[in-house]
Amino acid sequence: MNTEFINNIGLTHYLVLAALLFVMGMAGVLLRRNVIVLLMSIELMLNSVNLTFVAFSKYLGLLDGHIMVFFVMTIAAAEAAVGLALAVSIFKRFNEVNIRFFEHLKG
């Protein structure tokens, strides 16, 4: 099996993939109104940023990008935990997880 193409993947390929993932996540945030899908879209956007950090880190030969990924992953885990806890408590209270439902709840 010829695996030479793996060695030819450059920085541009990683950045294009990260941009596509980010756009997909942004589309999910802008177009969907479900809280769970919204959180998953934000996680996808954060993972595309992680891919960019790792790609630049590999390209420049530094470990700074890899270290930054750990911080982003920590923040993403905390964001997911808090977001899911809020979604569960909102669902228990209102039996609804649609964002449009909560626009009238300004206090």
UniProtKB/Swiss-Prot annotation:
Residue spans crossing the bilayer: 11-31, 36-56, 67-87
Major place of residence: membrane
NCBIfam families: PRK05715.1-2, PRK05715.1-3, PRK05715.1-5
A Pfam family: Oxidored_q2
Oligomeric and partner information: NDH-1 is composed of 14 different subunits. Subunits NuoA, H, J, K, L, M, N constitute the membrane sector of the complex.
GO molecular function: NADH:ubiquinone reductase (non-electrogenic) activity; quinone binding
Enzyme class name: translocase
Keyword Endoplasmic reticulum assigned: no
Cellular compartments annotated: Cell inner membrane
GO annotation terms (biological process): ATP synthesis coupled electron transport
Keyword Cell inner membrane: yes
Keyword entries, A-Z: Cell inner membrane, Cell membrane, Membrane, NAD, Quinone, Translocase, Transmembrane, Transmembrane helix, Transport, Ubiquinone
Protein name: NADH-quinone oxidoreductase subunit K
Lineage: Bacteria, Pseudomonadati, Bdellovibrionota, Bdellovibrionia, Bdellovibrionales
E.C. designation(s): 7.1.1.-
The protein's role, per its UniProt record: NDH-1 shuttles electrons from NADH, via FMN and iron-sulfur (Fe-S) centers, to quinones in the respiratory chain. The immediate electron acceptor for the enzyme in this species is believed to be ubiquinone. Couples the redox reaction to proton translocation (for every two electrons transferred, four hydrogen ions are translocated across the cytoplasmic membrane), and thus conserves the redox energy in a proton gradient.
Annotated membrane topology: Multi-pass membrane protein
Catalytic activity: a quinone + NADH + 5 H(+)(in) = a quinol + NAD(+) + 4 H(+)(out)
Superkingdom classification of source: Bacteria
GO cellular component annotations of the record: NADH dehydrogenase complex; plasma membrane
Gene3D superfamilies: 1.10.287.3510
Family: Belongs to the complex I subunit 4L family.
